[in-house]
Amino acid sequence: MEPLLESPATFDIFGIPTVIFSVLIPVAAVALFAYIIAKRLAPIVKARPDFRFDRPAERVKNILKIWLAQWRQPRYMMAGVLHIIIFFGFLILSVRSTELVIKGISADFVFPGLNTFLGDIYYLLKDYAATAVFFAVVIAAIRRGIFKPERYQYTEAYPHDHTWEAMLVLFFIAALMVSESLFEAAHVAAQVQAGVQPDFLAPATLGWFFKNLLVDESHAMLQNLHILSYYVHDIVFFTFLCFLPMGKHFHVITSIFNVYFMRLEKGNIRPVRYGVSEEEL
């Protein structure tokens, strides 16, 4: 890999090293995320204990079936398929997103094993996953914003419309896919211009499309786009992370825990106790 473009770890703007932002953004975001999670967990910590560590084998089976295999999603076929694409795309791309955060501090960082043939397989899957997720998000946004399926409509019993939140989440996801693809495409386009062996981009993917679009742009343009797309990805990634616990999409984080600790027997929900004082909690 030829370092034809400066990375966020070595670049500077008006004499200010951008690596400062590469450190400050995740540190501030993780601190804020920890604070938000602590606030969300406070009521659970005060709640009556309910032992859910029994039958671990059955609980692991539920994780594999309900969470990982997305067993229940095809109940609503179109929405279910889109959800499955986005879910598995996120699982695949989580490694790349984490890698990018670290690359902003250490330009040559690669997760162990990804500098071998396993990396070739992973990055191929990553390119197609990002593209599939992007188009799934576009279709989901069109369904939610234009066609508006009946089950998304809110009645007097459920008057709060969460369409804005769903659209914002879809925007965050699309922005992550586009910015990651642009970051890589700008670098590969610079390699092509220099006549060196370019890094492989899977055909018919977002990165491949952007590379073909950018290959005739100036070196300065590619450099600026490389840096800009990195920090767009960084800011959107951590903004999304901190936004999730504050809305209905908190399940993106909690779903694996919800499934593991789900009730294994029906009809054993404890009744709500009203009028409990702070001291009795």
Predicted stretch roles:
Residues E2-L281:
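Membrane-embedded alpha-helical bundles of multi-pass integral membrane proteins
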